Amino acid sequence: MAEAGAGLSETVTETTVTVTTEPENRSLTIKLRKRKPEKKVEWTSDTVDNEHMGRRSSKCCCIYEKPRAFGESSTESDEEEEEGCGHTHCVRGHRKGRRRATLGPTPTTPPQPPDPSQPPPGPMQH
């Protein structure tokens, strides 16, 4: 029986596969752009076309509406804006914000000559 097993042969085949991948030489370029400013002039529907050229413009000093925080009511400051800045060019008829009487002489009051007994005004001090 020892002779029966001697005639068998076994073949072992080893296959080695070597896969070589070349590193990809890709490059990624990211370009940074400056943000566009969010500030811009927006005219409301009641802005006057005072030049009749199809463009909206305003010489009213109080047309600007300050941006409000989220949830802040837009009616809180409407009373002040509608009552006024006191300028004659203002088409909204504002009247409230007149400060000329407290700041000094009005344009209708002639300027007062300097008092000779007083020293001339010096440099402004802060």
UniProtKB/Swiss-Prot annotation:
Protein name stated in the entry: E3 ubiquitin-protein ligase PPP1R11
Pathway assignment: Protein modification; protein ubiquitination
Enzyme class: transferase
Composition bias, Basic residues: 89-101
Disordered: region residues: 1-25, 70-126
Positions bearing N-acetylalanine: 2
Region named Atypical RING finger domain 2: 85-94
Catalytic activity: S-ubiquitinyl-[E2 ubiquitin-conjugating enzyme]-L-cysteine + [acceptor protein]-L-lysine = [E2 ubiquitin-conjugating enzyme]-L-cysteine + N(6)-ubiquitinyl-[acceptor protein]-L-lysine
Processing after translation: Auto-ubiquitinated.
Function as written in the Swiss-Prot or TrEMBL entry: Atypical E3 ubiquitin-protein ligase which ubiquitinates TLR2 at 'Lys-754' leading to its degradation by the proteasome. Plays a role in regulating inflammatory cytokine release and gram-positive bacterial clearance by functioning, in part, through the ubiquitination and degradation of TLR2. Inhibitor of protein phosphatase 1.
Keyword Phosphoprotein: yes
Species whose genome carries this gene: Homo sapiens (Human)
Domain of life, source organism: Eukaryota
Gene designation: PPP1R11
Tissue: Widely expressed.
Enzyme Commission code(s) on record: 2.3.2.27
Phenotype when changing residue 94 to A: Loss of function in inducing TLR2 degradation
